[in-house]
Amino acid sequence: GPGFNPQWTCSWGPLFRTFEIDYSRDRFLKDGQPFRYISGSIHYSRVPRFYWADRLLKMKMAGLNAIQTYVPWNFHEPHPGHYEFSEDRDVEYFLQLAHKLGLLVILRPGPYICAEWDMGGLPAWLLEKQSIVLRSSDPDYLAAVDRWLGVLLPKMKPLLYQNGGPIITVQVENEYGSYFACDYNYLRFLQTRFRYHLGDDVLLFTTDGAKEEFLRCGTLQGLYATVDFGVGGNITEAFLVQRKAEPKGPLINSEFYTGWLDHWGEQHWTVKTEAVVSSLSDMLARGANVNMYMFMGGTNFAYWNGANTPYAAQPTSYDYDAPLSEAGDLTEKYFAVRKVIQKFEKVPEGIIPPSTPKFAYGKVALRKLKTVEGALNILCSRGSTKSLYPLTFIQVKQYFGFVLYRTTLPEDYGNSTRLSSLPFNGVHDRAYVAIDGVPQGVLERSHVLSLNIQGKAGANLDLLVENMGRVNYGRFINDSKGLVSNMTLGSHILTNWTIFPLDTEEAVRSHLGSWAGCDDKHCAPGPSNYTLPAFYVGNFSIPSEIPDLPQDTFIQFPGWTKGQVWINGFNLGRYWPARGPQMTLFVPKHILTTSAPNNITVLELERAPCGSCGPELCAVELVDQPVIGAPVTHTPRPGSSHLMAEQRGMTDPSGF
């Protein structure tokens, strides 16, 4: 017809997609039209693939037009050159799912991500080079990063918006301005590699705390600078900090905190819905682009949690007091946020997927199977290593979990000799100590640095050392695990260690069921508050004739102390009710079955609720309500999460 211009239709067809910054009007342009994102963070590594679609759809129905996710390098390259991108690690499938639901993606591929994730996503094997300076232009570090980006980024390229995919912007590094190295050559290297793999038209950006000193080392010409801050901060001031770095262009809060992180032994954090609503409305009214961190927090399954310094590990739950709970449930915060978005944008009509039903399967009796020591031949299939002085986890190529250190007492030690890692605080992170199978007590990094023990010359001294999660933020992310210094006993330095890296996962998956009955020869009573680390197993059946089962549930540990739990071989993470605030662990239904009994395996490291010698059973309980905010009696360390919160503009106590 008249005025028909074939070239015009072609360029605006599905083939020609652009996403760019309009500097003259301080906004984004998507396919030439003004655009603003309202986004939420969800980490695919913290939500089972089974639930990705459910969580993403709930985010879409809240009115979000984008999601933001991190790519944890260590989740995908557990050993050098060994890559995992299938099942729960299938990041491409996750991003395609978001695309299918009409959600855009803000991708944060690191290589460092912080995220309260083990070592901020950096693989522990980087530490095999002892002098390595992480997050800098150290050639050893850059070589590993370069190889990784060469694997990851080509997978991301077809998913870029320009190429018909959902990814509109890509973050380079993560809050680099908060790190001591301040190495612009490193940022330049990343910029070059990102451009090489993703092309020149992709929008690259950085994120830093909204203080000028953070943007000094965190920004680079050619990377669009954004800020992050929470509910207590002064929004005008925060965006002025961004304006100093980027006088023109869209205002962006890349991490607007809907809640905050927890540590074992500290109170559970919450942020009031009213505070979230008022800051969110204010930012949206200014035309700002906002990503809510987190919109859906999820779970640190297995050993993936991080830690902060002075050393304090984060718990298994990463609920974050976010609008969607750890189990993906709708909260009042969800509906309040949706209402705010409705004032500014069109929110999808239709039915919001409901919270998933939970089922209380009740008490499950477990019997004690074997102590760790009694199961060494199964747990340590790779064999042990001998060394004059202790080796770290990395030196025996064990990245997660547990290593047993054994030596013999060089002489008789009567009435309480001091076993100690002083002055080095060298137990990273907890050691469960026994002599000839008699439990002695626990050493704990930064908390319990010595222990009185006694024993005869030639007796076995065993320290089972647990890696409780690597530091993920700040200067001390090169966090070695195991015995990282010598141990002294009285005035002797202990030598001639045999070191057993334990393959707990393999043992639990393949052998536990077949282990012969309980071995009670190690039944010497130790101090009443501490018994030998041991495995307990039991099972429960879910009747197949009840429709809709299995359903999600939560496991709690009445009377238990601290340990690790698996259901049907799936590592649910750490429990520590003795410390709190988390008392229950989330159990997603896809790991349960109705066709056979469900196996529960517990590795209790300190003390189970039944005698170590008697035949009586211990029980765990499957309940339908989570408890992640129990009161805490433990004395917290001086201000870790509060200090961090303050740095992120979360200073207004009314927000908590």
Please annotate each region the language model reported.
Residues 51-118, 191-199:
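Aromatic-lined substrate-binding rim segments of carbohydrate-active enzymes
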Residues 71-80, 88, 101-134, 139, ...:
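Aromatic-lined carbohydrate-binding surfaces of glycoside hydrolases
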Residues 36, 63-65, 99-105, 161-168, ...:
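Short, well-ordered coil/turn segments that N-cap beta-strands
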Residues 142-156, 163-172, 177-179, 183-187, ...:
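Carbohydrate-binding surfaces of carbohydrate-active enzymes
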Residues 8-12, 16-50, 57-61, 82, ...:
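Extended substrate-binding grooves/exosites of carbohydrate-active enzymes
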Residues 415-435, 540-568, 575-576, 600-603:
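Aromatic-lined ligand-binding clefts that engage carbohydrates, nucleic acids, or primary amines
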Residues 164-244, 248:
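Gly/Pro-rich turn-and-neighbor structural signature
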Residues 43-61, 80-99, 273, 414-422, ...:
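Aromatic- and glycine-enriched glycan-recognition loops and surfaces
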